[in-house]
Amino acid sequence: MDDHRLQAGELARLAGRDGPVTVLKRTMGLERTKVLVVRAGDVVVKAHPPGTDEKALRARLDAARALDGIMLAPLGLERLDGRLVTIWPAGEPLTMDDVEAGTTPWEEGGRLLALLHARPVPAGLPPAGGPSRLPRAMADLASAGVPAPVAAPILEAYATLPPVREGGALTHGDWHLGQIVRHGGGWLLIDPDDLGPGDPAWDLARPAAWFAAGLLAPDDWERLLTAYLAAGGTAVSADDPWRELDAPARALTVQLAATAVATGARAGEPPDDAAEALVSACERIVAAARAGT
């Protein structure tokens, strides 16, 4: 196997599956495949980044197995040329038909997050990985050759952010609509790579950031938030959810903006509409911080 470009067929054979293989995701690092996710028959196989902490991953997989009805349970953990590889039942992800029909599962997402946040944190589970994504995104921004005028508002917004609030709830750590699939007749959360104790508002922060940037329709945001609260979610206050959401939503805005413009710069492309909306949101964060001083 080429160590610089992990082969999809190798993953399928590791799972004991032959036949057509579909690459669902491939993320490249500087010189080699960082993450590779493939579907082979009725399973999905994921090669994790080099250097993934095996103890932490095993703890998260064990936690996912115990979240029946909330999170998809793994089928196994293997190794391939030093890489940790997880094997999963294949679920049915969100499709464009769902989006066009107005049946995106915002309510199910809110309900599942509320159920997750109500579960006790298993002993030995590492902290939620979501907050650590922000400094990584900023490091990526710094190394991607982003033009200074584009990077400036992101850097300025980053400087205004408060420290991450600690929390003891069981959280997903990186939730968005790509982290939910249909399986066994219902929707389930997937991808426990960042699962752990943390501030539960962080799990609502990405859609909150989209909403604040004008990238998520108000009705969709309301569907998610209403369902979350109706299911007993405690991450935010019903009377003023932004009291808890403001800081993590600003952090996710900065993270998403940094990732978007860095990705575009590496591809030699200007910021797209979504990236521009996120950068504009960073400018508003800076303006609000200046107005408050």
For each feature predicted by the language model, list its residue ranges.
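Conserved NTP-binding catalytic cores of kinases and kinase-like/nucleotidyltransferase enzymes
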Residues: 1-73, 184, 293
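Active-site acidic catalytic loop and adjacent metal/ATP-binding pocket
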Residues: 25-45, 159-202
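A conserved alpha-helical element in kinase catalytic cores
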Residues: 44-83, 92, 97-115
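Activation segment
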Residues: 50, 93, 187, 195-197, ...
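A cross-family kinase active-site recognition segment
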Residues: 95-149, 166-168, 197
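ATP/Mg2+ or Mg2+-diphosphate-binding catalytic cores
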Residues: 140, 219, 255-293
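Active-site activation/catalytic loop segments of kinase-like enzymes and analogous catalytic loops
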Residues: 201-234, 250-268
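All-alpha amphipathic helical-bundle segments outside canonical DNA-binding/catalytic cores
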Residues: 235-249
